[in-house]
Amino acid sequence: MSAESMNGLHRTLYCGELHKQHEGQEVTLMGWVQRRRDHGGLIFVDLRDRSGIVQVVFSPEVDQEAFKKAEGVRNEYVLAVVGRVNGRPEGTINPNMATGEVEVYAHTLRLLNRAKTPPFYIEDNIEVDENLRLRYRYLDLRRPEMHKAMMLRHRASKSIRDFLDQHGFLEIETPMLTKSTPEGARDYLVPSRVNPGKFYALPQSPQLFKQILMLAGMERYFQIVRCFRDEDLRADRQPEFTQIDLEMSFVEAEDVMGLMEQMIAEVCSDTIGVKISTPIPRLSYQEAMDRFGSDKPDTRFGLELKDITPIAAQCGFKVFNSTVAGGGQIKGINAKGCASFSRKEIDDLTAFVAVYKAKGLAYFIINEDGSVKSAIAKFFTEEEIAAIKDKMEAQPGDLLLFVADKPAVVAASLGALRVHLAERLELIPQGMWNFLWVTDFPLLEYDSEAGRFFAMHHPFTSPAEEDLPLLESNPGKVRARAYDMVLNGVEIGGGSIRIHRRDIQELMFKALGMSQEEAKEKFGFMLEAFEYGAPPHGGLAFGLDRLVMLLAGKDSIRDVIAFPKTASATCLMTQAPDVVDPAQLAELHIRSTAPVKKSN
């Protein structure tokens, strides 16, 4: 059977739209064959399009030619069918299908295209290697759950655009080919043919351009924009990603945060029907680190960190008191009801925190009589043990876990252990949406290996006004006018009030170890622009991929991106990146020095 043309046929309804009210109507449907079943005198075809599946029946009594064609139909063939909608007979209604009350008796069938046998079934809940799915992404995207993810992404984008339009924002595109100003991840570079030896960079964000748009008097800007970072891909990162980018003039931090939480609440309502209470709770960076060991804490469960440093400072356990003497701290987590953990289970937890550079994991097992079982208990007085139990809110049957180290190591290790235990003990409630603003970040963080400060967010973040005098004398103590939005332990957006004065921006560059010459070379255009009446301004950027992933209940952003890259930044479908013709390189005055792989 050869392929036919549509030849004047026009779809009248989508497959998933058919219901009881269409009974008796003639419809024209188009889609793919999900499955075909031959029941002797009748052939049943489940026809699928992006809206869903409907059962089509071919009977020789209705049309002999259509029935004959249907005998040759196979999975994933592309069909057009014309027929009458009938209610299904008693006992054949399928409650698992949205269209399960009806079926279409076809009198016309056109084979629009044939299909090879797919390498995996086109259905949900398949056990298929992800690389195979990415290799045949066009088939993977046919699956209903992928259709739902793409539709959800579309609805989220539309909701965002509608909200921002209603609040006076202008959607303005910024350049994709721009100047390389590396201050974090590596740039993707694009050679210029007409300017030999010079390169553009693909933007890591539109940061500079959106600030310049505020200088230009646009006042409210937004863009749903592609951004690029040539970084070593950690878990669930992409070299190209989509950002909801916006900026506002004449605002304070609360103005930006207040409007953005309204927008996110509207997006949640529009896309998944979830009502978000506003205002969203605020937590300072310091409190987040102290209580949760993370600047993006998941607040759906407890297991908060408790500081026992003052209690343990004078104890007889050398590891603890020497840590305190060296400027470190001791914090713990109360794993409620986990006193029954075996030694191997505790050793596994010790190995877990070692990944985060913790040198060990001390523990107290609280026995049923309230006594403590621990190899280190002998180094503590009864009063110290009682004080620790009180601080940790310990009860019989609990397991107290402690890390003694530098504050950064304590936070990283116990913060990760907190989440690990919550997952293992199934303490994380499903269907809960805990949003949080984290504020008052440090402006800078010191890298001892590099021997200098780096911006915790980016170099254009404004210092807290009361901390400005410290920018030259004690930059590590300066707080930023920055704010991150966190959802269930995932950072979904971050922003700040920006620097809008040249003198402060130059002080910031100086604090980052940048000479005047280097600052002028990289950001001279920005510094010059500040001299022409820059308004106070601030903004924020949300990661659209991560936001949609959470809305969809997925575990990976790859499941909400149509054509994602692998962890090695490759596209398995197109085989990008790839070698190019030497003539193309010659035009660009470029020669590859990459080692040539020997063929086997």
Curated annotation (Swiss-Prot):
The keyword ATP-binding applies. The keyword Protein biosynthesis applies. It is found in: Cytoplasm. Residues 207-210 are annotated as: Aspartate. It comes from the Bacteria. Keywords: Aminoacyl-tRNA synthetase, ATP-binding, Cytoplasm, Ligase, Nucleotide-binding, Protein biosynthesis. It is an enzyme of class 6 (ligase). GO terms for biological process: aspartyl-tRNA aminoacylation. It catalyses: tRNA(Asx) + L-aspartate + ATP = L-aspartyl-tRNA(Asx) + AMP + diphosphate. GO terms for cellular component: cytoplasm. GO terms for molecular function: aspartate-tRNA ligase activity; aspartate-tRNA(Asn) ligase activity; ATP binding; catalytic activity, acting on a protein; nucleic acid binding; transferase activity. L-aspartate binds at residues 183, 229, 457, 498. Pfam families: GAD (PF02938), tRNA-synt_2 (PF00152), tRNA_anti-codon (PF01336). The record marks 39, 91 as: Important for tRNA non-discrimination. InterPro entries: Aa-tRNA-synt_II, aa-tRNA-synth_II, aa-tRNA-synth_II/BPL/LPL, Asp-tRNA-ligase_1, Asp-tRNA-ligase_1_N, Asp/Asn-tRNA-synth_IIb, AspRS_core, GAD-like_sf. ATP binds at residues 229-231, 238, 491, 543-546. Its EC number is 6.1.1.23. Belongs to the class-II aminoacyl-tRNA synthetase family. Type 1 subfamily. HAMAP family: Asp_tRNA_synth_type1 (MF_00044). Aspartyl-tRNA synthetase with relaxed tRNA specificity since it is able to aspartylate not only its cognate tRNA(Asp) but also tRNA(Asn). Reaction proceeds in two steps: L-aspartate is first activated by ATP to form Asp-AMP and then transferred to the acceptor end of tRNA(Asp/Asn). PANTHER family: ASPARTATE--TRNA LIGASE, MITOCHONDRIAL, ASPARTYL/LYSYL-TRNA SYNTHETASE. Homodimer. This is Aspartate--tRNA(Asp/Asn) ligase. It comes from Desulforamulus reducens (strain ATCC BAA-1160 / DSM 100696 / MI-1). The gene is aspS.
